[in-house]
Regions:
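Terminal (and in a subset, N-terminal) low-complexity or junction segments at the ends
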Residues: 1-174, 179, 183-205, 211-612
Length: 612
């Protein structure tokens, strides 16, 4: 007799059992439970199992109900194993399995997927392997649902070879089987293997597309994430919010505003609700692509906000140089009752640094400690040192570092070294530089920065010692590259590039160079710190990646079009000066995102006020 038939029979005798069909709250559940205890119906395994299925959100209550069942059957044990397998107490699922075996109740193909899921949740390979042996022992090794669970478990635990062996032995594979393998490869960082399997799949569902696109995004292969999204659309698959978060985040990293705007339009056209995660991703995409006003607009339209979304907009305002606005948003956040997190304080302290708001910065720093009880982290100390350095308070910055309860890290010392360059203080630079190269001896950027400071002072013998140190420690400067989006296509430039239009690009650059020289531009070669003649240095600096990107952008866009460039390293002083001149001569606006911040070039000026 089926459980529903038994329940109907019992309900005819006890009408209140009908409540089991309509129970909608935990309070109702407890009332029904009390009734079952008083009427002794709790001893009926069919009734008790129905009650147990309603208590899946509370492991404690489920366990209490189970303790009142005199003769639990397989259905009851499966319910308990399922409830505990998805809870923080996943290990207890195995206790019920062991108890079930002691009662000589054999498992079925429902039992094992939940036990295997518990192993995956805890990333407990040893237990998972033991369950696998039981799968074989009880003859469920050819059940597709059990096999899919094993593939997922091994992949989640990083044993992709074991997952592959189970997958390879499967006599029948469905879309879940393939998707589990794609997901496993992505989680292990084997994105190319994931894509190969993705391409071999006979059928794909939305989950598969989402996993593959997210795999590219998490592996910093943002262009491929965006390209795969375009393929997905062409195949008629409609994305969901999860896919769009990956796509929008990829656009943010690439600085691909055009693609990002079209992604936003896609969200609206397909009637997707902009939830908190997607909304925050859109906000970040706009400010990372240089559209700060649009970022603020999207943020203000969010139906729901949290500390992370507030932190994002504050950080965006900070890196765009809007220090006062960032502090204003922070004050509004606090006024509305949102609790700032450590990342929020990093963002607002950075805003104070970029905005020259030293007094306000220290006020917020003290608030963080005293009002919110947040112990300063290295990032917060770094903001204070940077803030003092930007204000020219180099001695005060050194004293602050000396009083820190922890040793300074490379970014903190690097911030002070950067200030030494701006204020041309070679004495402090040498002292800080030596400390910095002990802390981070493999970071080429700090050697270059120290060398440039020596170059400003004409200390060529010091530069030579830095170069020798780099050779001795096998330090190499990473290749610089710049990205520019034209008509939805991402173009990447680097020195020595073999772009198909390189001849035209160089001729365009010579044309630009000729025009800005007429208004007084002379190549500043101090960033080419090698002790060679000036003509050779100038040739080197004019092949920098952002200059190639600028020339290409001016070739391919109409006059007056804003040109947006993303660079992986800090913009050098010469490129910064050149871009200011070009913005003035051509009446163009350039938005350049480098490793440190955004630079908005207009009418011969930069938003960073020549400090970056």
């Amino acid at each position: 007799m089926s459980s529903s038939t038994v329940l109907n029979t019992l309900r005819s005798k006890h009408p209140k059992l009908a409540l089991l069909q309509t129970c909608s709250s935990f309070t109702d559940l407890k009332i029904i439970h009390g009734f079952l205890i008083r009427t002794h119906l709790i001893s009926d395994v069919f009734v008790a199992s129905r009650l147990l299925s309603l208590s899946s959100n509370s492991t404690e209550y489920a366990h209490r109900i189970f303790s009142q069942i005199q003769s639990p059957n397989l259905f009851v044990f499966n319910l308990l194993i399922r409830t505990f397998s998805t809870s923080p107490e996943a290990s207890k699922a195995y206790n019920f399995y062991t108890q079930m075996l002691r009662l000589c109740i054999p498992p079925d193909n429902i039992t094992f997927p939940f036990l295997i899921k518990a192993s995956a949740e805890m990333e407990c390979v040893r237990t998972g392997e033991q369950i696998h042996s039981h799968v074989v022992r009880f003859g469920f090794h050819n059940d597709v649902y059990v096999e899919n669970s094993l593939v997922h478990m091994y992949a989640t635990c990083g044993l992709i070879a074991s997952a592959g062996r189970v997958f390879g032995a499967m006599s029948f594979r469905n879309v879940v089987s393939w998707t589990s393998m794609v997901d496993g490869y992505c989680k292990c960082g084997l994105v190319d293997d994931a894509r190969e399997m993705f391409d071999e799949m006979p059928h794909r569902n939305l989950v598969t597309w989402s996993i593959m696109i997210n795999g590219y995004a998490k592996s910093n292969r943002f262009e491929e994430a965006v390209e795969l999204f375009e393929v997905m659309k062409r195949e008629g698959v409609v994305a969901n919010e999860t896919v769009m978060v990956s796509v929008v985040s990829s656009c943010a990293h690439l600085g691909a505003l055009g693609v990002g705007v079209r992604a936003h339009e896609y969200v609206v056209e397909n009637g997707m609700g902009v939830n908190l995660v997607l909304g925050t991703a859109l906000v970040e995409m706009y400010w990372r692509c240089g559209e700060m006003e649009k970022a603020v607009s999207v943020f203000q339209e969010l139906d729901e906000k949290d500390s992370l979304s507030w932190s994002s907009i504050i950080k965006g305002l900070a890196v765009h140089g809007h220090g006062h606005k960032a502090v204003g948003f922070f004050s509004e956040m606090v006024r509305l009752g949102f609790v700032p997190r450590d990342v929020t304080f990093t963002a607002v302290l950075s805003a104070c640094s970029h905005g020259g708001l030293v007094e306000k910065g220290f006020e917020i720093y003290e608030m963080m400690k005293r009002v919110y009880g947040i112990e300063p982290r290295l990032e917060h100390y770094g903001c204070i040192v940077d803030m003092l350095g930007r204000a020219g308070e180099l001695a005060e910055a050194e004293r602050f570092i000396e009083k820190m309860p922890v040793k300074p890290n490379a970014p903190i010392l690097g911030a002070l070294l950067g200030a030494c360059k701006i204020y041309k203080n070679a004495e402090v630079a040498e002292r800080v530089g030596n400390m910095l190269l002990e802390v981070k001896p493999e970071h080429s950027g700090y050697y270059v920065l120290l060398s440039n400071i020596y170059a400003c002072a004409g200390k060529w013998e010091k530069i030579e010692s830095v170069r020798e140190m780099m050779k001795e420690k096998l330090v190499k400067k990473p290749p610089a590259w710049s990205l520019i989006e034209i008509d939805g296509k991402i173009n990447k430039f680097s020195m020595g590039d073999d772009h198909p239009e390189m001849g035209k690009i160089r001729r365009k650059w010579e044309e630009i160079l000729g025009k800005i020289r007429l208004v007084g531009y002379k190549g500043n070669t101090e960033d080419a710190f090698f002790d060679v003649d000036e003509e050779e240095k100038e040739t080197a600096i004019h092949m920098h990646s952002e200059k190639l990107a600028i020339a290409y952008g001016m070739m391919k866009t109409k006059p007056g079009t804003v040109i947006r460039i993303v660079k992986n390293l800090r913009v050098c002083e010469n490129c910064h000066t050149v871009t200011k001149h070009i913005s003035e001569v051509y009446g163009r606006e350039f938005i350049v995102r480098d490793r440190n911040r955004f630079h908005h070039f207009r009418n011969g000026l930069c938003s960073c006020r020549d400090y970056w």
